[in-house]
């Protein structure tokens, strides 16, 4: 377990970077977030959580939710049913690209770009009676925090600016790779993105990725093999177009969101969440990436 002094050092080390990135502004409800926030939390495979900075302040998890939705799909579907509809390759295009959907005849490159996450949401919508409620149930169980909730203002804000995601969904539907009602699935998807959690919640919730599929309370959520495969996808496709840079600098499987959060995993040891709302040109937290880089160097850890 890293000591508290190390986590505090990591936070202070990156503080000079504040002001160099930009807060996401294409979702009005996210644009008003205090740009000066910095937080980090780690949870060990023994279930102990430690944090520094603004680690208890909730934020919008955005695309980090795509890890939860894929995990939920893995518990409900045969793997062939999932991977026949979404690929496992890095994208190389922007996370909300229509061009790629057209070129690949409606099959998204991976589950962590918008097109792929919409297919996963479509799968969940078709198999669950109440997909929003089931997701809330899952993340509350994983984080051991019953107060985790959806931010309705953020969900509504995203829905009001959903033309591009709707276009992606309809394009996939034209290729036969989208089954449900587009509007209904979009609302579910935006609720997932609008989950509000803090660094401590997320580091606990993601422990199964570091712990062979087992959650904080020891329950097996997904198999050991599925966990390894999910971490492989996170290592190659979890950071938008910055996955290579992140692998080079940090050396851990990870997933970012435009709310400024990044989760990362040291398999067999730790799950980590960092938060700083200012983003780099790839849409990843600028200071958050630097925190993870410094932590990995100080711990001497990398999956490579």
From Swiss-Prot:
Coiled coil: none annotated. Substrate binds at residues 63, 114, 158, 165, 189, 240, 258. Keywords: Hydrolase. One of its GO terms (biological process) is glutamate biosynthetic process. The keyword tRNA processing does not apply. Its EC number is 3.5.1.2. It catalyses: L-glutamine + H2O = L-glutamate + NH4(+). GO terms for molecular function: glutaminase activity. PANTHER family: GLUTAMINASE. Homotetramer. Belongs to the glutaminase family. This is Glutaminase. The gene is glsA.
